[in-house]
Amino acid sequence: MQVILLEKIAKLGSLGSIVNVKPGYARNYLIPQGKARRVTEKVIAEFEAQRAELEKKQSEILAAASAQAARLDGLLVQISQKAGVDGKLFGSVTSANITEELRKQDFPVEKSMIRMPEGQIKQIGDYTVTVVLHSEVSAHITVSVLGETTI
């Protein structure tokens, strides 16, 4: 199915691109989320009329994401978990835990924005985690996992 993108989508295309996608992806995700429209002559004409407005909106979103990335970059997030004497956690620290801590510090992020290259954290220590705020903007934060040892 051919769709015209109304915003930049990572690994798919930029604003105004006409791309072929699987019908289910278009019907269930892109079109309901307002990220794309099915290609017809009428839709292309409407898009060209709204192009400047859409580009302005996208640049505002990018500027807001860049501002938030500047605030987030280098931030230290401390998370306490129960751990054994060897430093191994009982359980693990996931992207949901990191999201919760960031929200406590007034950073509105979603769980899907957190990228943990090593997967879930299972040891005490400091870890670098990436927060993807926009397809072009990301910030690196340090997650410090502290152990609450039980004796």
From Swiss-Prot:
Belongs to the bacterial ribosomal protein bL9 family. PANTHER family: 50S RIBOSOMAL PROTEIN L9. This is Large ribosomal subunit protein bL9. HAMAP family: Ribosomal_bL9. PROSITE patterns: RIBOSOMAL_L9 (PS00651). It comes from Nitrosomonas europaea (strain ATCC 19718 / CIP 103999 / KCTC 2705 / NBRC 14298). Keywords: Ribonucleoprotein, Ribosomal protein, RNA-binding, rRNA-binding. GO terms for molecular function: rRNA binding; structural constituent of ribosome. GO terms for cellular component: ribonucleoprotein complex; ribosome. Binds to the 23S rRNA. Pfam families: Ribosomal_L9_C (PF03948), Ribosomal_L9_N (PF01281). NCBIfam families: L9. One of its GO terms (biological process) is translation.
